[in-house]
UniProtKB/Swiss-Prot annotation:
This is Tryptophan 2,3-dioxygenase. Heme binds at residue 242. Binds 1 heme group per subunit. Heme-dependent dioxygenase that catalyzes the oxidative cleavage of the L-tryptophan (L-Trp) pyrrole ring and converts L-tryptophan to N-formyl-L-kynurenine. Catalyzes the oxidative cleavage of the indole moiety. Required for synthesis of the siderophore quinolobactin. Disulfide bonds: none annotated. Its EC number is 1.13.11.11. The gene is kynA.
Amino acid sequence: MCPCPYMHQAKPQQWHDAKLDFAESMSYGDYLGLDKVLDAQVPRSQQHNEMLFIIQHQASELWMKLLLHELRHARQLIDQGQLAGSHRVLARVLRIMEQMVSSWAILATLSPMEFISFRSDLGNASGFQSYQYREIEFIFGNKNRAMLLPHQHTPQIAKNLEQCLHTPSLYDAIIQQMTRQDLPICALRLDADPSEPTRSDASVEAAWVQVYRQPERYWDLYQLGEKLMDIEDAFRQWRFRHVTVVERVIGFKKGTGGTEGVEYLRKMLGTVLFPELWSLRSSL
C-alpha cells in the first residue's frame, strides 16, 4: 500500500496567521488561570442543577471582586480631589451592578423541587456569609460590626473586614470633598466614627441642596451625586431581585445561614445608603 503523502508533513504551526503552538509561550487559558477557575466547581450532590447554583454564586463573587477593585479606586481618586476622574470609574461600577442584577434571571430558572434536591448539601453555607458582599456594604457606608463575626474562623478575611469597617466610606470621602468647595458641613459629621453606619445629617443635606440648585458651579459634585443615585438605585434592584428569586424558589422557609430568609431580605430592602441624596429632593 502506498503511504499517505501527508503522513510525514510537519504539523501546522499557524492557522490564518493565528499561533497554534503554545508549548513555550503563554496561552489564553494560561493567562486567565482557567485550570483553577474551571476546576473550582465541585458539586456536593449528584443533582444536575447544583452546577447552576454554584456557578451563579461564583460568577457573582467574581463581579464583586471587580466591583470592590473599582470602588477602592474611585475612593482613592476622590480622596485625591480627582472628582472628574472618579466619574468614569463609578460609571463602570454601575454597569457591573447592572450585570449582577440581570444575572438573577438565570437563577430564577431553578424550580423549587430542583433546589430542594440538593439544598441539604449546602449545610449552613449562605450568601449572607459572603465577605466580599459585606465589604461592598461597608464601602457604601452600611457598617455593622456584628457582620465581622461570621468570619472569625478566617483570620485574614476578618482582619481585612475590620480594616474596611474603620475606613471612611465612599460617601464619607465625597462629604470631605464638599468642605473643600466651601460647603459647610457640621463638625460632628466630619468627625463621626467611620465604623458607624451612615446617618442622615442636616448639614450634609443642606450642602447637597446647594449643589443641586447650582449644578454648573458644583458640576463635579453634582455628577457624583447623580452617580451615587444611580448606584443605589441599582443596589436596590439587586436586593429586590434577590428577595423575589428566593421567595420564588424556597418560599418563606428559613435560610440555610439561619436567617428568616425572605422576611430578613425584605427588611434589608429598607436600607438607605446615601440618605441626604434622597431627602434633598423634597427640599428643592
